[in-house]
Curated annotation (Swiss-Prot):
The lineage of its organism: Eukaryota, Metazoa, Chordata, Craniata, Vertebrata. GO terms for molecular function: telomeric DNA binding. The keyword Nucleus applies. Keywords: Acetylation, Chromosome, Disease variant, Dyskeratosis congenita, Isopeptide bond, Nucleus, Phosphoprotein, Telomere, Ubl conjugation. This is TERF1-interacting nuclear factor 2. It is linked to Dyskeratosis congenita, autosomal dominant, 3: A rare multisystem disorder caused by defective telomere maintenance. It is characterized by progressive bone marrow failure, and the clinical triad of reticulated skin hyperpigmentation, nail dystrophy, and mucosal leukoplakia. Common but variable features include premature graying, aplastic anemia, low platelets, osteoporosis, pulmonary fibrosis, and liver fibrosis among others. Early mortality is often associated with bone marrow failure, infections, fatal pulmonary complications, or malignancy. The gene is TINF2.
Amino acid sequence: MATPLVAGPAALRFAAAASWQVVRGRCVEHFPRVLEFLRSLRAVAPGLVRYRHHERLCMGLKAKVVVELILQGRPWAQVLKALNHHFPESGPIVRDPKATKQDLRKILEAQETFYQQVKQLSEAPVDLASKLQELEQEYGEPFLAAMEKLLFEYLCQLEKALPTPQAQQLQDVLSWMQPGVSITSSLAWRQYGVDMGWLLPECSVTDSVNLAEPMEQNPPQQQRLALHNPLPKAKPGTHLPQGPSSRTHPEPLAGRHFNLAPLGRRRVQSQWASTRGGHKERPTVMLFPFRNLGSPTQVISKPESKEEHAIYTADLAMGTRAASTGKSKSPCQTLGGRALKENPVDLPATEQKENCLDCYMDPLRLSLLPPRARKPVCPPSLCSSVITIGDLVLDSDEEENGQGEGKESLENYQKTKFDTLIPTLCEYLPPSGHGAIPVSSCDCRDSSRPL
């Protein structure tokens, strides 16, 4: 078989699928590979997302790599080496024509703050244990969830810029990289397809099939992805675990894996100790779960505890209040899995229309609480205005609704024919095709499953 175009749309999608699995599975040890992919993509298609969006995601990935080394108890020499690699103290600043002065100022300040914070930790302060606990909390699950959402939006923009996926082209690339493996048997690829809203074929690919059309052509309603109708009539108890037969058709669960509710729907719920000794109010992501950590073949189960159930109910109530007061201006529909599970049919009409992908750019917008809404709970003298990487990742007050140049950028990229610039899935997998990226997430217990 002839070698497929390694920088074509199919290869880009496989690289995106691998990156998505790494971030989705919290595989911090592979974050540098995701950084490589994002930098390559930014170099050839700078218009996919705004500069600030790209930098927030990349800085978050780099910071998590360094923090993970610290929390694992690695030697400080190794930690500082990684710190200097990802955050060079006097490294050149990349001048992006799309970057504003405010963007550059915030990014530079966040990098410097993180660098000094790690340097101070390496000097063995007397309260090292409390500092490490604070670091673990600051770069914990809310931070990772915000990064995952940033990457999802990035990949959505990439998908909008690429042509319609063709199953045969995808199979050709996968067969070249992993002989004998079908796109229907690759868990990472199936998960990516489900999350991106495709209907993957259940059988082996024998001809060129348009993966976008079956959503309208497939007659069984239960086989359709809930993108344009994310709130179908639900039978009582549909969120409960079903028999083995329900696990063979993961497509109906697509709407339950994601909710594109903006990060603005969150509550400021805790104070965070700053690196300079004061206290500042720190936003925490409190949004409907926009995907399930399990594999696409898993069904959504009930919350594990009453406390968890209360959190979901509170978040649902927040969204309902926002919709009833008329503050939700986006004409998109909710895709939240557990929100749908808690109240599948009684959501207000405005809430049902909030997060639909029919909206041109609103699902990709991070609409957050304005700064003036955050009232300090400590004296002004104790409040720190230091911007950290965690602030930039969790906070997007100034995220603009103008990311729409991806199509032109990728067309220009295709004309340049830098065929080896974008890393492909080959670089994420062992050549045998039976290896796997170790999954560090507690929700992904099978670390031997293949991509």
